[in-house]
Swiss-Prot record:
Example GO biological process: actin cytoskeleton organization
Modified residues annotated as N-acetylmethionine in this record: 1
Protein name: F-actin-capping protein subunit beta
One GO location term (cellular component): F-actin capping protein complex
Subcellular location: Cytoplasm, Cytoskeleton
Organism of this sequence: Arabidopsis thaliana
InterPro entries named in the record: CapZ_alpha/beta, CapZ_alpha/beta_2, CAPZB, CAPZB_N, F-actin_capping_bsu_CS
Family affiliation: Belongs to the F-actin-capping protein beta subunit family.
MF annotations from Gene Ontology: actin binding
Function, in words: F-actin-capping proteins bind in a Ca(2+)-independent manner to the fast growing ends of actin filaments (barbed end) thereby blocking the exchange of subunits at these ends. Unlike other capping proteins (such as gelsolin and severin), these proteins do not sever actin filaments.
Length: 256
């Protein structure tokens, strides 16, 4: 099981679904563990009633149907489906509106969805999702890649309130893939994923949404910095070692 998870962590996000299917056929006895611990690139579905897109994941799935955060209905329709309580649904609606603003400010477009449900410990769980298409045909002013995708998954477990305090456990996963293709540099692809966790005890007087928002903003900022330093920084270092920039080569060449 550990070897399978290690392999999936090293697979490019584009190939993770194929790799997961192969592992499920090889070790079916671990299928439930693999499906619960492995994050796949996010898919999108259109809610005809609201006219908005929403993100599909295991957290809004029941059987083969997915619940829209906009209409609170399953697509395709499903009888005896699971729904959040009225109080939690109200919080979910507010979270979707606020997170859409966060998405536009940080990503300049894309698709976001928030789902909430009760857990078995008198608390609740919230899942915040963002999918950004950074290709030339994508939304937003920064779509300049041949292909590009940023998938962010933030899952927060909120414990029961004790003395006006609550425990928050945030697990964030970022999956990134990009491809450039131009005459000067040729075709280049880069992809990977990173996961981190944060735990905090915060006062509920500020509100759950405020607390969760601050945690997501802080951890996502750290993940962005890690991606920039590890993925892009190391890649830049390797490329410059193998193929130094033209100005450096000219500086090293003796005059003839």
């Amino acid at each position: 099981m550990e070897a399978a998870l290690g392999l999936l962590r090293r697979m490019p996000p584009k190939q993770s679904e194929t790799a997961l299917s192969a592992l499920l056929s090889l070790i079916p006895q671990h299928s439930s563990d693999l499906l619960s611990q492995v994050d796949l690139p996010l898919q999108v579905l259109r809610d005809i009633e609201s006219g908005k897109d929403f993100i599909l994941c295991e957290y809004n799935r029941d059987a083969d149907s997915y619940r829209s955060p906009w209409s609170n209905k399953y697509l395709p329709p499903l009888e005896d489906a699971l729904y959040p309580s009225s109080e939690l649904r109200k919080l979910e609606v507010e979270a979707n509106d606020i997170f859409a603003i966060y998405r536009d400010q940080y990503y300049e477009g894309g698709i976001s969805s928030v789902y909430m449900w009760e857990d078995d410990n008198e608390g609740f769980v919230a899942c915040f999702l963002i999918k950004k298409d950074g290709s030339k045909s994508g939304h937003g002013r920064r779509g300049c890649l041949e292909e590009g995708a940023w998938d962010a998954i933030h899952v927060i477990q909120v414990g029961s309130e004790e003395e006006e305090m609550a425990q928050y456990c945030l697990t964030s996963t970022i999956m990134l893939s990009l491809t450039t293709d131009d005459e000067s540099s040729g075709k280049f692809g880069l992809s990977g994923s990173i996961r981190r966790q944060m735990k905090m005890e915060l006062a509920v007087a500020d509100g759950h949404l405020c607390n969760m928002g601050r945690m997501i903003e802080e951890l996502e900022g750290k993940l962005r910095n890690s991606l920039d330093q590890v993925y892009f920084g190391k890649t830049r270092e390797m490329v410059c070692t193998l193929r130094p920039p033209a100005e450096i080569v000219q500086m090293r060449l003796p005059d003839t």
